Amino acid sequence: MENHEQTSFTFEIDNFLEKGDAISPIFISGGCEWFIRVWQIEDHLAVTLSVPNLESLRYGWERRTKYSFIVLNQSGRELERTFEVEGLFCTELLEWCHPKVMPTNKLQEVCLENNKLIIEVQVKVLEVVHEGGVTTEKEMFNIEGFDVLYTQVSRVSWLFVEHPNIAVDVRIKNQLVRTAYINVLLGLIETLDRSPRSLSETDLRDAHIELSELTEAGFKVDWLKKKLEEVSLARKNDISDGSQVEELEEHVKNLKLELDNEKIKSSTASERVLLLEKEVLDLKIELDRTRRGQPNLLYLKLRY
């Protein structure tokens, strides 16, 4: 594995608060070209390390690096520093971002001095592959001391960007066991990202077991514990709301059935009333005929 000296590049941005987004000139580190982008994401300052001039790179190129970002004031004093992250750059992964380098409110205080923002990036290139074969899904890469599949590189790298201390207390040496724990961690994250309603009691029970195993192995997963509690509560509320809906639907169904029965009864009663009214009318007609001396047809019908 190649091991180049760490190099630094400083990017000074005038009037950054007005611009909100800036891209640095290209610089060289480890014999490779790089550039950084600085911009604001919601309430934080974000910085990205990227690879330029892709058309000049050969098929199968890869770069493995360690990098960190530093925010400086006009006097060169360090105000904020990100954790050092190991990242793999390739055709599918052209850049890596630190989305929360500094809160925006603190950034405004920094930029008050001559309205200038200064970002320093420290890059150490660990390995460069200028040309290679086709990368397969089963190929393994080492990210922060853990062997992971090529298809997992992006997720694991981002995991260490967002939670840089997650594995500092892991003392397991066996690489196969370390890989197994990373797979458990990724699976747990995927489970908790699902809709609470879609999770079963078994899913939640397994999630608690996996969380306990990760904690015992030394992983710092308090943020996942909190998320598991939130998901469990959300599922409980969803089930409760769902039960109420089912009860209401059943009540509506019963009321509709009762209403249909009443309509049938009303229809039958209406027919009976009409029949009686007709009989009364017939009786009145026969009564009038009798009074006029005409034969009483109703009487004859009843007699014969």
Curated annotation (Swiss-Prot):
Q: Which residues cross the membrane?
A: none
Which Pfam families does UniProt cross-reference here?
MATH
Which InterPro entries does the annotation name? MATH-CC_domain_protein (IPR050804), MATH/TRAF_dom (IPR002083), TRAF-like (IPR008974)
Q: Which SUPFAM superfamilies is this protein grouped with?
A: TRAF domain-like (SSF49599)
Top-level division of the source organism's lineage: Eukaryota
Describe the location of the MATH domain by residue ranges.
Answer: 6-123
Q: Which UniProt keywords apply?
A: Coiled coil
CDD domains hit by this protein? MATH (cd00121)
Q: Does the keyword Transit peptide apply?
A: no
Protein name in UniProt: MATH domain and coiled-coil domain-containing protein At2g42470
Taxonomy of origin reads: Eukaryota, Viridiplantae, Streptophyta, Embryophyta, Tracheophyta
